[in-house]
Structure formats: structure tokens, C-alpha cells
């Protein structure tokens, strides 16, 4: 499978997820609870973000005096660049707000997403059907919860560094891309965990399928430009990611 095919497959992951969930009552029910949580969080973010922008900006400026000086310089000396800087800054804020809400939803919805992915992989023939798979589901859910909490610590450290880098001229371009890749990997990680991939195998899968993750990251960024849309669509990304993972794995197994 060519790199361009992988890229397109990654780009259309959410639409694969929509089709899967909307055409299966069982998958729909598994996605419904975290989806309702996502809708609630999305509405809350949409309202709070646009009604408290001034307060949020004041807090940022008080916390980072050097940023205040930087913005005063840009706004005072080069008004056009200042406007561009402010626009990019708010894009950055929206992306990171969505990212942290995504982490919260992953933690809350981990048991449902684990079972959702497991059902899809069984349907695609990558997992053997098990009549009483409650123990496996419970084990996978707890393991994914622990992994998610561990990744939360790592990602919070990384996002703190990215937050500082974002105020560098190239940072406002690189940060959304990196955030997109981080979330793209996390969406596929449910499938990798169900297949019992080791850390080395997960890293190898990521590096050997960069075109697929690039398409998926781009789809995530597209959905992120409308506040709340990505959090509402998260079950579709995870379900579509599992289906795409199965498709790629089976295609590579036959070549």
C-alpha cells in the first residue's frame, strides 16, 4: 500500500467511524455514553471559551510578563504582525483546550472505547471472537486507563514545553502539527493495545506508517477548528482508526 493511499486512509478515518457506528446498533450503544459526555464537554468549551476570552487573556498575561512585553512590542511597533500573532495565539489556545478535553474524555471513556475497538477488531478478523470476554475487556480497560494516566503526565510536560515554543515564530506552526500527531497516535493506541503490541512495536508501527498518521493528524486539525466538534467526534476517530488499522494490517499481511 503506497504512502498516498495510507495518507488518504488516515484522512478519512472519522468518516469510516461514522459509517461503522451509525450502521451497527451494538457499536452505536458503545459509543453513545462517551459521545454524550463529549457533547457536554464540547458545549461547555464553546460557551466558556468565547465568553471568557478577555479574562483568560488577562490571566495569561499576568502569568507570563515577558509575553505581555512581546505582545506590546508587536502591537505597538508592527500592528499587522501583532494582529497575526493574536490570531495564531487564539488558534493555539483552541487546539490546546481541545487537547486537554480530549485527554479527560479518553480517561472517562476508556472502558467504552476499549470494548468498541475490540468489537471492531473481532469483526475484521484480527481478534478471535470470545463468548465471555468480560475479563479481557476489564483487563484491557484498566490497562488503557493506567497507560492513559501515564501518558497524561508525559503529555502535560510536553505541552508545557510546546506552550512556550508556540510563542516563537515557527512554534505557532509546529505546535498544532505536533498536537495533531500526538492525538492521532493516541486514537490508534487502543487498537495497538488490543493487539498486545509492546512499546517497541508501537513505536515501530508509528514510524513506519507516518503517512497514515499524517492524514489522521490533518483530519484532527480540520475538526479542531470548530470548537467542540472534535470532542463530539472522538468516538468516530477511535472506531474509524480501529477499522483503518485492521485494513492496513491485513493488507500488509498479504503482501
Q: Where do the language-model regions lie?
A:
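Extended alpha-helical regions
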Residues: 215, 219, 225, 248-255
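N-terminal entry module detector
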Residues: 1-61
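Membrane-interface segments at transmembrane-helix boundaries
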Residues: 4-18, 56-76, 103-142, 187-206, ...
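Long, highly hydrophobic alpha-helical transmembrane signal-anchor segments
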Residues: 19-20, 28, 49-95, 135-160
Amino acid at each position: 500500500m503506497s504512502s498516498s493511499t495510507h495518507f488518504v486512509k488516515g484522512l478519512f478515518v472519522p468518516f469510516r467511524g461514522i459509517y461503522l457506528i451509525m450502521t451497527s446498533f451494538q457499536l452505536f450503544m458503545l459509543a453513545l455514553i462517551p459521545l454524550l459526555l463529549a457533547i457536554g464537554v464540547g458545549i461547555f468549551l464553546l460557551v466558556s471559551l468565547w465568553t471568557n476570552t478577555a479574562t483568560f487573556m488577562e490571566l495569561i498575561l499576568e502569568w507570563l510578563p515577558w509575553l505581555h512585553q512581546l505582545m506590546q512590542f508587536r502591537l505597538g511597533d508592527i500592528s499587522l504582525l501583532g494582529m497575526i500573532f493574536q490570531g495564531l495565539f487564539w488558534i493555539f489556545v483552541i487546539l490546546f483546550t481541545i487537547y486537554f478535553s480530549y485527554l479527560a474524555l479518553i480517561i472517562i471513556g476508556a472502558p467504552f472505547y476499549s470494548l468498541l475497538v475490540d468489537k471492531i477488531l473481532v469483526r475484521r478478523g484480527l481478534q478471535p471472537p470470545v463468548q465471555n470476554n468480560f475479563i479481557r475487556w476489564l483487563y484491557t480497560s484498566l490497562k488503557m486507563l493506567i497507560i492513559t494516566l501515564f501518558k497524561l503526565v508525559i503529555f502535560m510536560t510536553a505541552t508545557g514545553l510546546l506552550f512556550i515554543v508556540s510563542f516563537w515564530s515557527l512554534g505557532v506552526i509546529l505546535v498544532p502539527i505536533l498536537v495533531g500527531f500526538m492525538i492521532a497516535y493516541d486514537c490508534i493506541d487502543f487498537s495497538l493495545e488490543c493487539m498486545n503490541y509492546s512499546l517497541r512495536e508501537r513505536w515501530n508501527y508509528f514510524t513506519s506508517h507516518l503517512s497514515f498518521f499524517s492524514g489522521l493528524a490533518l483530519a484532527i486539525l480540520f475538526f479542531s477548528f470548530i470548537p467542540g466538534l472534535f470532542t463530539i467526534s472522538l468516538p468516530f476517530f477511535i472506531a474509524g482508526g480501529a477499522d483503518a488499522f485492521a485494513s492496513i494490517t491485513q493488507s500488509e499481511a498479504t503482501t
